[in-house]
A protein has these predicted regions:
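A short, N-terminal "cap"/entry segment at the start of jelly-roll beta-barrel domains
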Residues: 1-39, 101, 105-146, 226-227
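Glycine- and acidic-residue-biased ligand/ion/polar-headgroup-sensing regions
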Residues: 50-51, 60-75, 165-181, 187
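Fold-core signature of tandem repeat domains
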Residues: 47-49, 55, 67, 86, ...
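Short histidine-centered beta-strand/loop micro-motifs
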Residues: 45-46, 56-60, 77-78, 96-97, ...
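Ligand-binding loop in jelly-roll beta-barrel domains
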Residues: 28, 38, 79, 90-114, ...
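Catalytic core of non-heme Fe(II) oxygenases with the double-stranded beta-helix
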Residues: 28, 53, 57, 132-149, ...
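Short acidic-glycine-tyrosine-enriched beta hairpin
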Residues: 74-93, 179-199
């Protein structure tokens, strides 16, 4: 299966109700943002668990990255409330469940070779650092060999200078509206800007975004998955 699998293309996804599809596990649906592979896949998805859903214990051969967007996601290691960011490195396993239901942003098989760090951050209590331009605050989440992941908070009226992303950029708009010369991206929008793309983003109303840079074209454990 291939969904938005040409990583040289700019992709903008504004999720619609009809975009959600059932997974093999009852009570779990997903919206595929990009995907290469069948059930073992290099994948970026939104995943929704219905209340009282469970998922069988499984191992992540290529690692798993999760941001909890809504509800409480649980496994044998604890309860993970909204805003929790974690990385389960290659070879780790767990048995997910949820009592109230939850919505997750999930990336699979995208760990770099040699990246073995386990990460868990409750971002709603995390520290914010000054950004590179007035009106921006940044909460770093992870960095490995030039691939960086962070939350970025935009105050209303913030303008970022035009810049180029040699290693590409991926954004999930969590709150507010982000804009650039190509359009406006309200909360829930997912964007993938290819390598060497250029833009001048801004936010008139303010925004909170998840952003990953430097990963397109960088080595990942899922590179060997082709279909």
């Amino acid at each position: 299966m291939r969904v938005n699998a040409d990583f040289s293309q700019r992709i903008v996804v504004r999720p619609r109700p009809e975009d959600w599809v059932a997974s093999p596990q009852p009570g779990v649906t997903r919206l595929m943002l990009d995907r290469v592979g069948a059930e073992v896949a290099r994948a970026t998805s939104l995943v929704r668990y219905a209340p009282r859903s469970t998922f069988p214990a499984h191992t992540h051969g290529g690692g798993e990255e999760i941001l909890v967007l809504d509800g409480t996601f649980s496994d044998e290691f604890g309860d993970h409330p909204p805003g929790t960011y974690f990385r389960n490195p290659p070879g780790t396993s767990h048995a997910p469940r949820t009592e109230e239901g939850c919505l997750l942003f999930v990336k699979l098989w995208q760990f770099a070779p040699g990246d073995t760090a386990a990460v868990r951050i409750e971002t709603r209590g995390g520290a914010w650092l000054p950004g590179r331009t007035h009106g921006l605050e940044v909460m770093p989440l992870h960095e490995h060999q030039g691939v960086s992941t962070a939350l970025v908070r935009w105050a209303p009226g913030t303008q970022f200078p035009a810049h180029t992303h040699p290693g590409g950029e991926e954004i999930l708009v969590l709150e507010g509206t982000l804009e650039d010369e190509e359009g406006a991206y309200p909360a829930g929008t997912w964007l993938r800007n290819p390598r060497f793309s250029r833009h001048a983003p801004f936010s008139r109303e303010g925004a909170l975004i998840y952003v990953k840079v430097g990963h397109l074209g960088a080595p990942a454990l899922g590179d060997a998955i082709t279909a």
